[in-house]
From Swiss-Prot:
Pathways involved: Organic acid metabolism; propanoate degradation; Carbohydrate metabolism; tricarboxylic acid cycle; isocitrate from oxaloacetate: step 2/2
Name assigned to this protein: 2-methylcitrate dehydratase
Keywords in alphabetical order: Lyase, Tricarboxylic acid cycle
Gene name, Swiss-Prot/TrEMBL: prpD
UniProt function note: Involved in the catabolism of short chain fatty acids (SCFA) via the tricarboxylic acid (TCA)(acetyl degradation route) and via the 2-methylcitrate cycle I (propionate degradation route). Catalyzes the dehydration of 2-methylcitrate (2-MC) to yield the cis isomer of 2-methyl-aconitate. Could also catalyze the dehydration of citrate and the hydration of cis-aconitate.
Matches recorded under SUPFAM superfamilies: 2-methylcitrate dehydratase PrpD
Reactions mediated catalytically: (2S,3S)-2-methylcitrate = 2-methyl-cis-aconitate + H2O; citrate = D-threo-isocitrate
Species of the source: Salmonella typhi
Enzyme superclass (EC): lyase
One example GO MF annotation: 2 iron, 2 sulfur cluster binding
Superkingdom, natural source: Bacteria
Keyword tRNA processing appears in the UniProt entry: no
PANTHER family from the UniProt entry: 2-METHYLCITRATE DEHYDRATASE, 2-METHYLCITRATE DEHYDRATASE-RELATED
Similarity annotation: Belongs to the PrpD family.
Length: 483
């Protein structure tokens, strides 16, 4: 005899309702959140512009079908593309994420909340261009900043206590959910329609972490966020037509997300949605490196300077010991061959060896031309990592959110340097005063990669004037980035 399952349509899951109520009703009052969102916007766009230097990224950009023309389509910064909002979202977020140089959120689940900008910016630009064509008011960049804060918050708050990586799911599912909610609200959907849209995001089959880990690490990790944001825009547009949703997408017995994909567990929440995530987000300012290694790379750069002063080189190194936190060991402690740039930028041994050898770590250092230097792999073999439980505890402490690494170098002559400890990277909220000037310099460098001096200055004049930027129509701001 089969078990009876009621066919009474349930109310929407509380987790979905909370997301929708937040995007529709929450008023952002935090000055710190808006200040940070402003810098986050600049940094994120700059990361996308740098990615245009890499053919592996550029080959994925443009319309799905060459020659497609979209009247009043969304612009893709640094290109001549004008696309439908779904494909524009893919283009923008793929650029943003390509070099692993945009922001980071570390918690039970990791991720990069500025990945959401692709969907937000593409939708806002498309809506603005169509509004102007119809004689109506466009959206402003202040609305983009508000959308960023809310997308950051949804992705980051769910990530605080819920480890999707533990069940093999990729964090871009949170990009899809967050972008769907924010974009749906931006599109003017009703509450019921946004509920439907968010439920559609949860019932999608979710991306696996296969492409982020040995032996399959590959470039999908660089366009997975673009895939997620484009899907979000697609689902929001479907919901706008009146497409139905699935109220117990998470909790349905046997067939819901919890039973199918989360081992029957339900989500835990540390705090209500507000503006906490944007206020505390981590910027990758100095090095394009997986964030659990940022402080290790900074320590390695300090050690390189000490070696220079002492007349030593990496050839004199006998052993390197890295005292670290558990998440670092689980994600980027990697031995054996590294097959491509995506493999290398997720290997702490590689990311420490390069600065110890050359006194630098740039995106180009992950390419084959640099990686074929046999000294790198030779030094990797001398690097040993172990967990310090205190570092792990500080990593999970919501009041600290430290990402500590400490490095000791021993030399073949029996000497050693004192351990270099870095607990907070320069992109951490505790080091904003140090970090923001460097972030702006990073933005300027990335503008110079794609634009002539006059165009760079036009972009900077608006971008660094917060009041002017916030009032500017989205379409006019993105027009500044046309090649």
């Amino acid at each position: 005899m089969s078990a009876h399952i009621s066919n009474v349509r349930p109310d929407f899951d509380r987790e979905i309702v909370d997301i929708v109520d937040y995007v529709m009703n929450y008023e952002i009052t935090s000055k710190v959140a808006y200040d940070t969102a402003h810098y986050c916007l600049l940094d994120t766009l700059g990361c996308g512009l740098e990615a245009l230097e890499y053919p592996a990224c550029k080959k994925l950009l443009g319309p799905i079908v060459p020659g497609t023309v979209v009247p009043n389509g969304a612009r893709v910064p640094g290109t001549q593309f004008q696309l439908d909002p779904v494909q524009a979202a893919f283009n923008i977020s793929a650029m943003i994420r390509w070099l692993d140089f945009n922001d980071t959120w570390l918690a039970a689940e990791w991720g990069h909340p500025s990945d959401n900008l692709g969907g937000i910016l593409a939708t806002a630009d498309w809506l603005s261009r169509n509004a102007v064509a119809a004689g109506k008011a466009p959206l402003t960049m202040k609305q983009v900043l508000s959308g960023m804060i809310k997308a950051h918050e949804i992705q980051g708050c769910i990530a605080l206590e819920n480890a999707f990586n533990r069940v093999g799911l990729d964090h871009v599912l949170l990009v899809k959910v967050a972008s769907t909610a924010v974009v749906a609200e931006m599109l003017g959907l009703t509450r019921d329609e946004i509920l439907n849209a968010v439920s559609l995001a949860w019932v999608d089959g979710q991306s696996l972490r296969t492409y982020r880990h040995a032996p399959n690490t590959g470039t999908r990790k660089s366009w997975a966020a673009g895939d997620a944001t484009s899907r979000a825009v697609r689902l929001a547009l479907m919901a706008k037509t009146g497409e139905m949703g699935y109220p117990s997408a998470l909790t349905a017995k046997t067939w819901g997300f919890y039973d199918v994909s989360f081992k029957g567990e339900t989500f835990r929440f540390q705090r209500p949605y507000g503006s906490y995530v944007m206020e505390n987000v981590l910027f990758k300012i100095s090095f394009p490196a997986e964030f659990h290694s940022q402080t290790a790379v900074e320590a390695a750069m300090t050690l390189y300077e000490q070696m220079q002063a002492a007349g030593k080189t990496a050839a004199d190194i006998e052993k390197v010991t890295i005292r670290t936190h558990e998440a670092c060991l689980r994600i980027i402690d990697k031995k054996g061959p590294l097959n491509n740039p995506a493999d290398r930028d997720h290997c702490i041994q590689y990311m420490v060896a390069v600065p110890l050898l050359f006194g630098r770590l740039t995106a180009a250092d992950y390419e084959d031309e640099v990686a074929q230097d046999k000294r790198i792999d030779a030094l990797r073999e001398k690097i040993v990592c172990y967990e310090d439980p205190a570092f792990t505890a500080d990593y999970h402490d919501p009041e600290k959110r430290a990402i500590g690494n400490a490095i000791t170098v021993e030399f073949t002559d029996g000497s050693r340097f004192g351990e270099v400890v870095v607990e907070y990277p320069i992109g951490h909220a505790r080091r904003r005063a140090d970090g923001i000037p460097k972030l702006i310099e990073k933005f300027k460098i990335n503008l110079a990669r794609q634009f002539l001096t006059r165009q760079q200055q036009r972009i900077l004049d608006v971008s660094l004037d917060r009041a002017r930027l916030e009032q500017m129509p989205v379409n006019e701001y993105l027009d500044l980035y046309i090649i």
